[in-house]
Amino acid sequence: MIAAGIDIGTTTISGVVLNTESGQVLMSRTVSNDSFIDTGNPWERVQDAAKIVKQARLVLDELLVQHPEISSIGLTGQMHGIVYVDQDGHAVGPLYTWQDGRGNLLEFDGHSLTEVIRTACGLQTASGYGLVTHLYNERNGLVPTEAETFCTIMDYFGMVLTGRKQPLVHTSNAASFGFFDVKNGCFQEDKVAVVWLDSAVLPAVTDRMEILGSYQGIPVTAAIGDNQASFLGAVGDKENTVLLNMGTGGQISVISTEYFETSGIEARPFLDGKYLLGGASLCGGRAYAILEKFFREYLRAAESGEPKVQYSIMEVLARKGKAAFTSCGAPLAVDTAFSGTREEPDRRGSITGISEENFTPEALTYGVLHGMAKELYDLYRKIDAGCKISVSHLIGSGNGLRKNPVLVEIFEDMFGTGLELSSYEEEAACGAAKSSCMIKI
């Protein structure tokens, strides 16, 4: 089959045309998602939903013009965030993104909303989760009066394409809102009631790949989460395979037939009744960018003019640092939790084991890469301890791995197996295309 996949990301919108039998990408297109709205509130991260839909439709239309043989359309995009829709299926407000910080504001007797939820319901949530955002809006009179329900931006795009008046949210996206029972595939309405929310606002949910309707006569399927889509695009449904993604953040994912969660590890709905076990490092590849900025700022102070980007030099430093790391009895160690963790948002990174001999640019550069990898490897060890998943393959995605061979080698050393870079650069869009062909009659 020839399928189209659309990925509505936070900063870009991508589309691909994929031959799902051969795996060949016939066409790809990526445009900037420049839809952020400046509200004047530094904690608020919202985007213009109408502008996103317009840009995404232009990308899709271009694919359809170039490839009229497309027989299905799959959707994915940024999870957690919500768009309110009215009874006619129209957006009534912006997209409140996963980056939104209202859930961390200390506005409830000196506590954040996530703390209130944890105390009242025993649930671990994060600011940016859809129901955390909705609860804050409800308590502050910010929910539009016309709002009937809410959904993700890719669900809303599916509604616009097909003319649906009510969203149908796949469990992979519904779970990202919070207050969701992953085992049973439904919202935890009893806990929703504890925080005085009306469950009538919750969207309809499905755990199957279903057809939403059609666009230009072509079936459009329910959107899936970008984490699941990226795994499907890069790995497929292979077991014993770990997907490592290193972009702005870092993420580790593996398929399991067994439900398992622990601190730092989340079980997310996948497809065909399976689970995607995953964990994330919040800083991820940004840790390396922070180090690059550090070196560049030094050069700016030492020289006149604007210094060039330092990544090529840092690769040389990292290579030398690796040799020193393996031969040094007490290597410098970097904890790259510069932005905290999901469980400990106030935690910060550190550099330890500094000596006269190892405090060098080479050791620091390699130490940051090693710290980035160790954050994800430590998360894998938690999965392995709970599920005994033996790793036979490593698949890597994201520019942090594609552009950094030393980081690839570090992961290979840690896991004791080779790492293969994903065949696709637009894994999520390819996964969305694949998902559109998984309809079961």
Question: Where are these predicted regions, by residue range?
Answer:
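Short alpha-helix plus adjacent loop in nuclease-associated cores
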Residues: 96, 100-113
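Short, conserved phosphate/pyrophosphate- and ester-handling motifs at nucleotide-, phospho-/glycolipid
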Residues: 48, 100, 226
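A short local loop/turn or secondary-structure capping micro-motif enriched for an aromatic residue
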Residues: 34-37, 101-103, 285-286
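N-terminal glycine/serine-rich phosphate-binding loop of ATP-dependent small-molecule kinases
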Residues: 1-94, 119, 146, 218-222, ...
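A conserved helix-loop-beta module that forms one wall/lid of the active-site cleft
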Residues: 189-210
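Core-facing hydrophobic residues within beta-strands of well-ordered domains
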Residues: 70, 200-202, 391
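Short beta-strand-loop/turn "lid" adjacent to the catalytic site in phosphate-handling enzymes
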Residues: 43, 65-97, 123-128, 158-182, ...
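Active-site core segments that coordinate phosphate-bearing ligands/cofactors
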Residues: 4-5, 17, 108-127, 132-166, ...
